[in-house]
C-alpha cells in the first residue's frame, strides 16, 4: 500500500474551501466501549462497541478578508456546519476518499499569536451525527 504525505488536503467548512488557510487537519473517530460482563463471567470483562464520538481538529492561519477564515467561521459559532475533508484536492476515489459530516462549532479563537508570529487558531469541534465516507 502506498504511503501518503499530506500536501494538498481539501477542507471545506460551511461550503467554503478553506484549504489554503489550514495547516493541520485531524479527523478522529472513536466508539464507546460498553461493558456487557454478566454474572458467571470469571475470566475477563466483555464489551461491545457503543455510540461513536467523533471530532475534527483544524489549525487555521487566520485571515480577516471577506470570504476567508474569520468571515466563514465567526457566523457559524453555536451552529452545526457542513464539513468535507479529503486527503487530496483531486477527484474523490478509492485512493482519495471524501469524509462528509456536520461539526458543532463550539469554539473559536479569532485572535491568537505573539509578536512577530503568524496569527493562528486551533480548534476541536465535535461531529454532530455520523461521518459519511465516499470513494466515488
Name every feature range the model reports, one short phrase each:
Residues 1-136:
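Signature of extracytoplasmic/envelope-associated structural regions
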Amino acid at each position: 500500500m502506498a504511503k501518503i504525505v499530506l500536501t494538498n488536503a481539501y477542507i471545506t467548512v460551511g461550503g467554503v474551501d478553506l484549504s489554503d488557510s489550514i495547516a493541520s487537519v485531524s479527523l478522529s473517530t472513536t466508539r464507546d466501549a460498553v461493558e456487557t460482563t454478566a454474572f458467571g463471567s470469571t475470566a475477563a470483562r466483555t464489551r461491545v462497541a457503543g455510540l461513536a464520538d467523533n471530532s475534527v481538529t483544524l489549525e487555521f492561519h487566520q485571515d480577516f478578508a471577506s470570504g476567508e477564515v474569520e468571515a466563514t467561521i465567526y457566523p457559524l459559532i453555536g451552529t452545526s456546519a457542513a464539513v468535507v475533508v479529503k486527503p487530496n484536492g483531486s477527484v474523490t476515489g478509492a485512493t482519495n476518499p471524501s469524509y462528509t459530516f456536520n461539526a458543532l462549532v463550539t469554539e473559536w479563537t479569532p485572535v491568537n499569536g505573539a509578536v512577530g508570529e503568524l496569527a493562528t487558531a486551533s480548534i476541536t469541534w465535535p461531529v454532530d451525527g455520523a461521518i459519511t465516507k465516499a470513494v466515488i
